[in-house]
Amino acid sequence: MIMSSRSFLEYRAMFALEERDLDGVVLDCAGGASGFVAEAGTRGVRAVAADPLYAHGAAVLSERLSAGLEQGDAMIDANAERFVWTWYGSAERRHELRRAARRAFAADIRRRPGSYLAAGLPRLPLAARSVDLVLCSHLLFTWADRLDQEWHRAAITELARVSRGEVRIFPLVRMGDGEPVPFLGALLADLRAAGLSCEVRQVPYEFQRGARHLLAVTGSRTG
């Protein structure tokens, strides 16, 4: 899987975030090297990130991120027809946002290590309903070729367990080929049968062609 570094601005667009969505505690899972928590902190937003990679030292994180950036760029180059540049405007603008996010993450994890939890799905060391909003970027569904339907069910159920409000997941297509996730419909049926509310919403962001929807999940009230 690729470790990436997306910006606060990208998160706002991908997750259709409004100011009121950021009033409570926000969990970014899996956070990777996203700059979201860092910039959220400068805006007075209470945000934390979770990722198993945070258990490693700065050198390992830097190495993984460098490799991830190279892999991501190579994947984009190899599948150029599957990407839309309207939101970014240019490749350089995307690179600028990613470089700034990477710098913000690197500085913030040193300055505020308590905001970065070394943990991963499908089980988080967090109490039930301990955050107000969960954001999950480019993990669920993105890697559906490696993570099966049962893993997704367990992971989403866990994210809903720790959230008092919504879980927002983006995107809903697979990495690289941008194809629909074959088990999405069956998974949503399973989640709804378990008492979770699931809603697919369009967002004001599209980079991977066809990836312009998020999944919002609410409803878990058990620990």
What are the residue ranges of the model-derived segments?
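Class I S-adenosyl-L-methionine-dependent methyltransferase module
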Residues: 42, 46-114
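A short, conserved alpha-helix within the catalytic core of class I
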Residues: 143-158
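Conserved beta-strand signature within the Rossmann-like core of class I S-adenosyl-L-methionine
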Residues: 155-156, 163-173
